[in-house]
Amino acid sequence: MGLYRVRVSTGSSFYAGSQNQVQLWLVGQHGEAALGWCLRPARGKETEFSVDVSEYLGPLLFVKLRKRHLLQDDAWFCNWISVQGPGANGDEFRFPCYRWVEGDRILSLPEGTARTVVDDPQGLFKKHREEELAERRKLYRWGNWKDGLILNIASTGIHDLPVDERFLEDKRIDFEASLAKGLADLAVKDSLNVLMSWNSLDSFNRIFWCGQSKLAERVRDSWKEDALFGYQFLNGTNPMLLRHSVELPARLKFPPGMEELQAQLEKELQGGTLFEADFSLLDGIKANVILCSQQYLAVPLVMLKLQPDGKLLPMVIQLQLPHEGSPLPPLFLPTDPPMVWLLAKCWVRSSDFQLHELHSHLLRGHLMAEVIAVATMRCLPSIHPIFKLLIPHFRYTMEINVRARNGLVSDLGIFDQVVSTGGGGHVELLRRAAALLTYSSFCPPDDLADRGLLGVESSFYAQDALRLWEVISRYVEGIVSLHYKTDESVKEDLELQAWCREFTEIGLLGAQDRGFPVSLQSKEQLCHFVTMCIFTCTGQHSSNHLGQLDWYSWVPNAPCTMRLPPPTTKDATLETVMATLPNFHQASLQMSITWQLGRCQPTMVALGQHEEEYFSGPGPKAVLTKFREELAALDKDIEVRNAKLALPYEYLRPSRVENSVAI
């Protein structure tokens, strides 16, 4: 009984407000009060009013709301509702929403304090949890884009996605406008090319967008250098392939006359300075046919040596696997004629483009984040602490992935049009890679140890990934410790166990034999798993996404396709190189897509800087504040280090890491 002060916050994106009336109910532990039709929410505004309630409500548990429309359903994006009372000295309760309110159904918002099932011994929220999850399981259904791939949200297009997973209007307008600009520029360049020759490496300057990236200009000017070629395996846009060699690869067969090379490799191996990048995943992948023209793939192996100054230099390149009964494939060396060596490196860079975009970026970044998101939406209610912890890291992931499946890797999509693995090879490559995913490879401390990169001082990716993982891990531990006091409390959380099982057994098609857990038996195991989820959706994706504009704008450094077969002799000329690299249209389309996906996103939210407040109470806020302080300190450390580097490494700098897979 008494006076309650109610505040209602509406989102600031276009069309977030509504002309429809909204009715509220306050639901307490001892009673319920209808407040009537009390507001028409305005975009970007907080609406405040007071209401006298005659019933005794007790501690507030829910706010219920319903929108009424006469002629047109005008959706409303509600941020949160705050209720303070009874009286001026009454407690304040916060009810997070952060979703669209549509139609005229009643929506129940639980008070923002996170609760596991164990935290609700009276069962005050039991019915709500069950009903919410039942509804979500109907809304968030598993789909299977291609047989043999990890699962995705069941959606044929953006319009049948759950409404809360779609781009807000400002994001949609920016994304579609940038796409239109890129395609318009492509059309202009294509029309101009009719009158111009395409016969030298300088011709690629005609489609290079100056002023977009200083590093891209540096790549254009220095891409032929062996040091820059090797640097990309350490700190480029795909740092996931390089391994420290523990023996010479079995596939590395030495033709007669190569004894000196073998001795040099053995010497580097014994000294612990030999590294390798093996592209065997491409073996047997069918190459694309574009406009009746056959494209080609290689299966390179690169052996590199780490110098005392930290430079990683290539020693030998093998472009094909040896096959019994066939001549040994040639080994290309830095001492070969310049065009021969350059063409071999171009083949490696094109192969890296394929594995990066499909394996490291799409599969390990986008699709893995989607599995985490769908499993979470199906298994954890909005009141659960792990749901509240993870939900900011799913923003826009499902829509950007649907757009990728319908535009980039779809039939007649970008890959089919200009990429050598298109036309079906890209799907087979994804299947192969998905079957090899391991839990440890998503956890930098384990992955970097396995690949032997922990002690490589010039691997800034390794250094920054470890530090960012540790910061995220402490953040997760802070939240988990507020809600799980013992290992037993983790085991007893049936929602948590169902979530873990759904992720591994269903979303990943039964990946427990590759280390992914099907249950969580301790606080430590829970923290490690949740840290993996957040790092995958943030740092890991950013490390494979942010470098695209820098390293792929100069097309010869990362050719999307190759138009002649890999060389079997050492007689390449400039004409051979130009006939092998992408033609004008292919290069222009690569540049346009690279710009659209790699440009600075105006709606970008940096790691940990989300405005949504899903938790209530001082404990979680203190943990988030400490997380932000640690991110800022790491950001500053990286800034100071980068000031001393000829090539600054920015891709895991917290201020540049996006809070979710949103592009």
Curated annotation (Swiss-Prot):
The listed locations are: Cytoplasm, Cytosol; Cell membrane; Lipid droplet
Known function? Non-heme iron-containing dioxygenase that catalyzes the stereo-specific peroxidation of free and esterified polyunsaturated fatty acids generating a spectrum of bioactive lipid mediators. It inserts peroxyl groups at C12 or C15 of arachidonate ((5Z,8Z,11Z,14Z)-eicosatetraenoate) producing both 12-hydroperoxyeicosatetraenoate/12-HPETE and 15-hydroperoxyeicosatetraenoate/15-HPETE. It may then act on 12-HPETE to produce hepoxilins, which may show pro-inflammatory properties. Can also peroxidize linoleate ((9Z,12Z)-octadecadienoate) to 13-hydroperoxyoctadecadienoate.
> Which co-factors does it depend on?
Fe cation
Span of domain Lipoxygenase: 116-663
Consequence of changing residue 393 to L: Labile enzyme with loss of enzymatic activity
Name the UniProt record assigns to this protein: Polyunsaturated fatty acid lipoxygenase ALOX15
Say which species the protein is native to.
Sus scrofa (Pig)
- Quick one: effect of changing residue 106 to V? No effect on the stereoselectivity of the oxygenation reaction
Membrane topology of this protein:
Peripheral membrane protein
Variant or mutagenesis effect after changing residue 128 to L: No specific effect on enzymatic activity and iron-binding
Q: What is the effect of changing residue 541 to L?
A: Loss of enzymatic activity and iron-binding
- Which Enzyme Commission numbers does its entry carry? 1.13.11.31, 1.13.11.33, 1.13.11.-, 1.13.11.12
Residue sites binding Fe cation per the record:
361, 366, 541, 545, 663
Q: What class of enzyme is it?
A: oxidoreductase
Describe what happens upon changing residue 426 to L. Decreased enzymatic activity without effect on iron-binding
The UniProt-reported impact of residue 418 to I is:
Alters the stereoselectivity of the oxygenation reaction. Changes the stereoselectivity of the oxygenation toward the production of (15S)-HPETE
What's said on domains? The PLAT domain can bind calcium ions; this promotes association with membranes.
